[in-house]
Amino acid sequence: MKKNLLHILSLLLVMLTGATLTAKADSYKVAPMTAGKVTVSPNDEFVNAPINITNYGTNPVKQITYTLYDFDTQESSEPQTIDFETPFDNMQQVMIPIKPGKSLGKSDVIFNVTEVDGHPNETSITYTYIERWTVLQAAKKRVVFEDVTGLWCQYCPRGIAIMESLERLYPDDFIGISIHDGDALATNAYSSMLSSTWSNTNRPLIMCARDEKVNTHDGQSNFKYELDKTASFDISVKATYDGKDINVTSSVLPCLDVEEGTEYDVAYVLTADGLKNDNWGQANRVGEWNDQVLPEYDRFKGNESTLYGLEFNQVAIDSKGVQYGVDGSLTRPYTVGTMQTHKVTFENISQHKLIQDKSKLNVCALIIKKVTNGDKIKATIENAAKCRVDVGETGIKQIGNNETNTVTGYYSLDGQRLNTPAKGITIVRYADGSTRKVRN
C-alpha cells in the first residue's frame, strides 16, 4: 500500500514538474522584418506602411503593441495595439499609419514592437526602420508581369489565365506582356532575353517585375507584394501612329533620391491585343485546371487537349532596349521634381505581319533599374506605364453593323462572374478585351 502511494506521489510530482517547465517554456517573441520606403504628401493625414512581422514565440499571436519614434520630431507615439482576428504562427503583414514629415525629404521612423499578447516582447531585435519620404508628388506604382509562353506548351494556359485575370481585376495597376517562344505568335521583341537570361528555363516562365518567378495559379501574392513597394520614379507614356511609324514619348519624374551606383533607363515594348487565327491551337493539360476558381480558367477545363479559336492579348510585337533600357534615355542627376522626357520610334509598322488591328496596339514603357555587381548586371523593373496607340483615322479597323464593342461580362472585385451589375463597383468586360470599373 505504501509503495503504491509513493508511486502515485512520484507520478504527480513528475506531472507537476512537467507542467511547470511547460509554463516556463512559453515565450513571446515577434520581430519586424526590414521595411521599405513609403512616400507621403504634406496634405495626407497618413499613409500605410506594410511591414511583415515574424512570430518566433511558442504560441500563436493574438495581439501586439507597438510605438513609433519619429526622427523628424524626436518624439515617440503612445502605445498602439493591433488585434488579430486569426492568431498567426509564422508571418503576418501589418499596415502601420505613418504621418508626413515636418519638411520635404527623407526622415526615418522607428517601428518598435513592445508587447506580445500583453507580455514584454522577448525577441532580440524588436524594431525596424521605416524610410519615410515626404514629397509633393508620389509615384503611381504599376506592376509588370512578363509571361514567356507558347502554343505548344500544355501548362501555359496558367500564364494566360493569370495575365488576363490581373488585367481584369487591376486595370490601373497591372501591365502584362506575353512573350511567345517557338510558335506562330513569336517575334524578335525579346530575342536578347530569350537567348540569354531566359534561355534555360521552363515554360511558362512568368516573371513579376523581373525580380520573382510567379509559381501560383493566380499571381496575387507576387502582384500585391510588388505593388506595395515604393517606386522612385513616376512615368507616363503616349504613342501616335502616323500611317507608317509609331512615335513614342515617355515622361519620367524622379520622386525620391536613389542610391549611388544604381542606374536607370527606359525600355519600350509594343504589344497587340485581339489576335486570332483559326489555325492557332493552344496545347492544354487536360484536368490540370479543374479546381481553379478564376473565370479565366473556365475555357481550359474539360477534355480538350488542344484549344482553337482563342483570342490572344498583350502579345509582344517589337521593343526598344528591352533588356537594359535604351541607353541614355534617363540621365544623371535624377533630380527630384525635375521631369525628363525621351522619344523613340517604332519604324515601319507594316513589317509586323502579326498585327491584325492597329487600334489594338499598346506601348509599355518600363523603367529598368540596373545594379552592377562585378561583371554582372541585375536588371529589374522599377515602375512602368502603358498607353493605347493613338491611330486617329489612319489605322482603325472599320466596324460593321454586327461588330459593336458590346459588354461580354460583369465581374465582382474578387473575380466572381455576375449576371447583372452589382451595387457598388462592378468590373465590366467588353468584346474587344478591355475592362472598366463602373460604380452603380
Task: Enumerate the language-model features and the residues they cover.
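Intrinsically disordered, low-complexity Pro/Gly/Ser/Thr-rich segments with frequent PxxP/GP/PP motifs
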Residues: 74-102
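Local sequence-structure signature of Cys/Sec-based thiol-disulfide redox active-site neighborhoods
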Residues: 135-174
